[in-house]
Every structure is written in C-alpha cells, then in structure tokens.
C-alpha cells in the first residue's frame, strides 16, 4: 500500500540521519444560539446509523456541525494527561515526531523549560500516555458515529493557551480544520476536543459558527494582526462577521465533537492561568488522500513540508501526503487507505 511505501521510504531516510528531538517552533465575539434540532432531513449526511446518538443529538449535529457530550473523560485521565504534558514541557520526555510550539510573544522572553513557555504540543501519536486519549472507549464510541469502524488518529494536540501578554497572540483566528487536511471525504472526519478544566470566555473558550459545516472550504492565510500570529495559525480570509456565534462554555471532561468544515476559533486568555484542552482529529481509513496542487491549501502544504524537511534533515524527499502517512496511527479496525 502507499502508506507502507511512504513510511518505509521515510524510515530509511531517518535510519541514516538519526531522529532529532521534538522540533520547537515559535509559534469580536457575537453570541448567538445554535439552530434547534427540529428538522427531519430526508437523509442524514453527516452522521452514520448507530445506536449511540439519540435522534435529537443526531439532528443537532446534522444542523449545527458540532455536539457537546458532558463529563465524558474522567478527572483521573485528565490528571494523567496533564502530568505527561508537564514532563514534556520539562524535556523529560521526547516522543518522536512530536512538535512543541511556543507563543510568539512569550518565546522571546527566555523562560526556563516549563509549561509557561509551551502553548501547544502537536502529533503526540507516538507518546503512549497521551495516545490513550485517542483510544478511550467512551471517546471512540462517539467517533464511530461519524467515521465508521475503521478509525485513524490523524492529528493530535494538547493546547495550553497562555495568559495573554497584551498583544492578543493567545487568540486563534476563525478557521476550518479541513484547510490542513489532504484527505477526503470531509464527512468521514471528526474532531474530539476535551476541556481539561473549566473553560469560558474569560480564558478563551471555543467559539463556533453553527451550520457553517454545510458550506465550502474557504481560503485561509495568516491574519494581519498587529501583535503577531503564532506559527500555522491560519485563519479564514473571507467570512461574514455578522454570522451568529456560539461560545462553548465547558467543564472539565466535557467533550465537543465537530465537523472539519465548521468555522471555529478561540478568544484570548484574559486570566492568569493556562487554559488546557486535549484533542484528536479522526478520519475513517476509507478516506483517500488528494492532491492540493492548485488549491487554496497549497500555502499550508508548503509550510508543513518545510517543517518536516527541517525536522528530518531531508530536502525534496517529502510531499504533503507523506507527512500525514508517517504521522497517523490506527485506533480501531483496519488501516485501508490513510
């Protein structure tokens, strides 16, 4: 299969070059109600037949593109994920392939290694402790409602939104996750995003634009923010600023599942604490890779390839598809295409 060939090719390259430690990168809300789940579609488009979601939950996701499940992840699991994150921040753990990101405003201040300087870790699929999140049975049973039984963990994050420095760099611009993904169909992709503590507008909760998952993928680029923008924080260049928005106030353990075309972002953290959340983007292994050449995704493809080539010390040996094939990991079922 392609993923075997690509993985083997990269493994050979890395075998000669050795694997470096995790790369470190310097990295106007209007509230509105979600649409009521009172419609009867002729055919469900965004959810699969199952006995997990109630009819009302299924209708809500179909109409709005997201669904919050309360108290899904235990306090004990969240504490374990927090402890492992702190070990990574202290550089006691260096899983292969993981990216450690710093806030663009904080990175210049020269703090010692700690959670104070790390704003996010990405691609922790090879860290067995954090990967437990991706495989939690209570998470996976909901994921299967969107992806079907063959489930891949495609992209993982533990987000540590820092107190804003005053430059508003702790914001995450409104975006669609599909901008970052070279695989389709989008309806077989879902994100699980779990609050690791109480999250509200004060510390930068998620904000979503209900129903936008029904629209197209929009062009993304870096927003022109005066205080600077974190690495790979692309945002939508064209959206209706008057669109209704919902701010997701969540308690520790609450989990939101959302579609990759749903427009969402987060505000700045106005508190003195660090706002933590853990997430995984899942895709059905029946999805297929696509070429993004000539599309609005070319800009992120160039950026990801550049980072991967720098990490692995290779030039011209990778394409966008390779970077995903090497990172993703099977969660359940059979690995078919991805």
Swiss-Prot record:
Residues binding Fe cation, per UniProt: 175, 177, 264
Reactions listed under catalytic activity: phytanoyl-CoA + 2-oxoglutarate + O2 = 2-hydroxyphytanoyl-CoA + succinate + CO2; 3-methylhexadecanoyl-CoA + 2-oxoglutarate + O2 = 2-hydroxy-3-methylhexadecanoyl-CoA + succinate + CO2; hexadecanoyl-CoA + 2-oxoglutarate + O2 = 2-hydroxyhexadecanoyl-CoA + succinate + CO2; octanoyl-CoA + 2-oxoglutarate + O2 = 2-hydroxyoctanoyl-CoA + succinate + CO2
Binding site for 2-oxoglutarate: 120, 157, 175-177, 193, 266, 275
Cellular localization per UniProt: Peroxisome
GO cellular component: 9+0 non-motile cilium; peroxisome
Cofactor annotation: Fe cation; L-ascorbate; ATP; Mg(2+)
Chief localization: other
Protein's UniProt keywords contain Iron: yes
UniProt key word Lipid metabolism: no
Its biological purpose: Catalyzes the 2-hydroxylation of racemic phytanoyl-CoA and the isomers of 3-methylhexadecanoyl-CoA. Shows activity also towards a variety of other mono-branched 3-methylacyl-CoA esters (with a chain length of at least seven carbon atoms) and straight-chain acyl-CoA esters (with a chain length longer than four carbon atoms). Does not hydroxylate long and very long straight chain acyl-CoAs or 2-methyl-and 4-methyl-branched acyl-CoAs.
The protein's assembly and partners: Interacts specifically with FKBP52 and PHYHIP.
Family membership noted in the UniProt record: Belongs to the PhyH family.
Name of the protein in question: Phytanoyl-CoA dioxygenase, peroxisomal
Species whose genome carries this gene: Rattus norvegicus (Rat)
Higher taxonomy: Eukaryota, Metazoa, Chordata, Craniata, Vertebrata
Gene, per the UniProt record: Phyh
């Amino acid at each position: 299969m392609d993923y075997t060939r690509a993985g083997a090719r990269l493994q050979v390259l890395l075998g000669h070059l050795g694997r470096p430690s995790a790369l470190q990168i310097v990295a106007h809300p209007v509230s509105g109600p979600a649409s009521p789940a009172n419609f009867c579609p002729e055919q469900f488009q965004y959810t699969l037949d199952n006995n997990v979601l109630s009819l009302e939950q299924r209708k809500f996701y179909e109409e709005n593109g997201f669904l919050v499940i309360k108290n899904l992840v235990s306090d004990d699991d969240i504490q374990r994920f927090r402890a492992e994150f702190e070990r990574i921040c202290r550089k006691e753990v260096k899983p292969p392939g993981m990216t450690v990101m710093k806030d663009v405003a904080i990175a210049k201040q020269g703090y010692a290694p700690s959670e104070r300087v790390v704003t996010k870790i990405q691609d922790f699929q090879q860290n067995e402790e954090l990967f437990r999140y991706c495989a939690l049975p209570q998470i996976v049973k909901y994921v299967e409602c969107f992806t079907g039984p063959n489930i891949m963990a495609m992209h993982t994050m533990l987000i540590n939104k820092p107190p804003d420095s005053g430059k508003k760099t702790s914001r995450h611009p409104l975006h669609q996750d599909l901008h970052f993904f070279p695989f389709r169909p989008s309806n077989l992709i879902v994100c699980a995003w779990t609050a690791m503590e109480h999250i509200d507008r004060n510390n930068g909760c998620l904000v979503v634009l209900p129903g936008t998952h029904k629209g197209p993928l929009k062009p993304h680029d870096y927003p022109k923010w005066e205080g600077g923008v974190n690495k790979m924080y692309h945002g939508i260049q064209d959206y209706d600023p008057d669109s209704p928005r919902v701010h997701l106030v969540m308690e520790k353990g609450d989990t939101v599942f959302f579609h990759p075309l749903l427009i969402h972002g987060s505000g700045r953290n106005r508190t003195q604490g660090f706002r933590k959340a853990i997430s995984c983007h899942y895709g059905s292994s029946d999805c297929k890779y696509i070429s993004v050449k000539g599309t609005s995704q070319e800009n992120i493809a160039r950026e990801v390839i550049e980072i991967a080539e720098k990490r692995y010390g290779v030039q011209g040996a990778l394409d966008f598809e390779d970077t995903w094939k090497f990172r993703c990991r099977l969660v359940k079922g059979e690995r078919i295409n991805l």
